[in-house]
Amino acid sequence: MEDDAWLDLVGISADPPNRRNKCEKCKRPVVVCWCPALPHPPEAVSSQIVILQHPAEEKRSLRTALMLQLGLEPGKCVVYKGKRFPNHRNHADLQRILDSPQTLLLYPSRDSVPLEEVDHSAGPYTLVLIDGTWPQAKAIYASSPALHRLRQVKLIAVGISDYIIRTQPTEGCLSTLETAAQCLAVLESRPELRQTLVRPLHTLCKYQLDNGAVEHQSKEFLLKNNQYPKPIGKRLSRLLRNTACDGNEET
């Protein structure tokens, strides 16, 4: 009996189990590859997108920054990772970008101006985006003095996110891909560019919905409609009441 057990053990393969074949480009399993939805050839733009990515974003299973990188010509979207910028891994390259007068930072501060009002004829521009949750983005900004010197811009008309399989904080929150695509559509004066670059996200969401995922509403929507499953504090409750009152006055 014991000898048979040892024979069974010897017969077990030492090789790791076979995993699903993955696409070389998007690194997704082939059956859920969104590469066919990418623009072919990649979009040629004069602007450049620089993404400062919080390390936690790299762990997310559904990341959209790669969609942007593959949807644009090589070098038109670069990603730097960290919690403070520049850092020892990217100091020289990123510092040159941050020192350029043509570099803009998308950040909703008091000093930010609508991207639509920037003089597009003075371009091309490099647009810096911070990729992370809002608390992560604020922490990156606070710990990166080099970002404080950049001209700051914001998007006015953002609409509702198409990333419907992920819960967004508010109705106006967009994924990294959607944000960059909208900015490029403005900077390049090509409104159709947003839809073209976001197409892989639509493909991803459709596959997930077809295979059991559910469509998500934003936390703001759930809270305003008394559908949020967790208790909220008095401060947030008061803010929501005031927002509702302001909305009623406008209508």
Swiss-Prot record:
UniProt entry keywords in alphabetical sequence: Metal-binding, S-adenosyl-L-methionine, Transferase, tRNA processing, Zinc
GO CC terms, sorted: cytosol
Chain residues that bind Zn(2+): 23, 26, 33, 35
Motif (DXTW): 131-134
Catalysis: reaction(s): a uridine in tRNA + S-adenosyl-L-methionine = a 3-[(3S)-3-amino-3-carboxypropyl]uridine in tRNA + S-methyl-5'-thioadenosine + H(+)
Disulfide pairings: none
Taxonomy, superkingdom: Eukaryota
EC number(s) recorded for this UniProt protein: 2.5.1.25
Cited InterPro entries: DTW, DTWD2/TAPT
Gene Ontology biological process: tRNA modification
Enzyme class, first EC level, given as a word: transferase
GO MF annotation: an example: tRNA-uridine aminocarboxypropyltransferase activity
Domains as described in the record: Contains 1 DXTW motif.
Function: Catalyzes the formation of 3-(3-amino-3-carboxypropyl)uridine (acp3U) at position 20a in the D-loop of several cytoplasmic tRNAs (acp3U(20a)).
Family (UniProt): Belongs to the TDD superfamily. DTWD2 family.
PANTHER family: TRNA-URIDINE AMINOCARBOXYPROPYLTRANSFERASE 2
Name of the molecule in the record: tRNA-uridine aminocarboxypropyltransferase 2
